[in-house]
Amino acid sequence: MLQSTLAGEPCQNKHDRKSGAHPSSSFYIGRGPSIERSTTSTVRKREAIIFGATGAVGSELLRLCLDGSRYSRVTVIARRPTSMTHEKLQWVPAEFNALEDLATISGLVDGDAYCCLGTTIKAAGSEEAFRRVDYHYVLNAARFAKQSGVTQFSLVTAIGANRDSGILYNRTKGEIEAAIIAMDFPSLNIFRPSLLKGKRAEFRLKEEIGNWLFLLMTPLFHFGLQRYKPVEISKLARALYVSADPEHKTISPRIFESEEIQAY
């Protein structure tokens, strides 16, 4: 059954067959646009759901959603609460392998869902555990969002996402992209950042090494390697938030490559 706590803290085209995988029957440039637009009493405020709000990207995105005027309510679905408190914040404790237990709030969301779930093989402990989070849990989140009436879904994957890749990480990211594209959300944004740069609750050695290597390679970014430059976590969160503004919509699905995210 649904349990919610207000003010707790806790979260390329559709025909591009190379961008991701087939749906599974299993259940988981310059400066960017201005971050907020004025609202009037005639504009109905939207609602938001965030999956993964306790992670580095999700927590930064949550702050933007709460501080901005776009949303009247922000629902975080997570196993544990975040450290933030706000009158618009609603925390719904849940396990991502059992989101069907939350079916009681279906149809109550008039707005957007953001999915910032993700891990690494090392952090997950095995390839199977990694895939459970990055594919099945993400797919569960998207299904739940769809059933809840969400009209716009924003998904974070990674640079190099490709369902035909021989690398498990890239292949899994590509497969989940394709599965969610097939769900046919009215509006879908997919973000493919390079390595993420910023403060994390957990230490990721490979990302830290990668960030140092890219720092040494900075001069090469002017020679075609810009897309591999590490992305600030704050920029990714801003890109997620700004792109969800209805006034900024263009095509769907819209894929934001890493160099585009750098512009925010």
Regions found by a protein language model. Give the residues of each.
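Conserved Rossmann-fold NAD(P)-dependent oxidoreductase catalytic core, especially the SDR/UDP-sugar
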Residues: 68, 124-128, 132-177, 182, ...
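Short, conserved active-site loop motifs that form the nucleotide-linked donor/cofactor pocket
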Residues: 88-89, 188
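Oxidoreductase cofactor-interface core, primarily capturing Rossmann-like NAD(P)-dependent enzymes
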Residues: 67, 163-264
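SDR active-site strand-loop-helix element
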Residues: 51, 77, 116-117, 153-159, ...
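N-terminal Rossmann NAD(P)H-binding glycine-rich loop of SDR-like oxidoreductase domains
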Residues: 47-68
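NAD(P)H-binding glycine-rich loop region in Rossmannoid oxidoreductase-like domains
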Residues: 48-49, 73, 89-140, 144-147
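Short, polar loop motifs at secondary-structure junctions
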Residues: 76-83
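Short, charge-rich patches within N-terminal targeting peptides
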Residues: 11-15
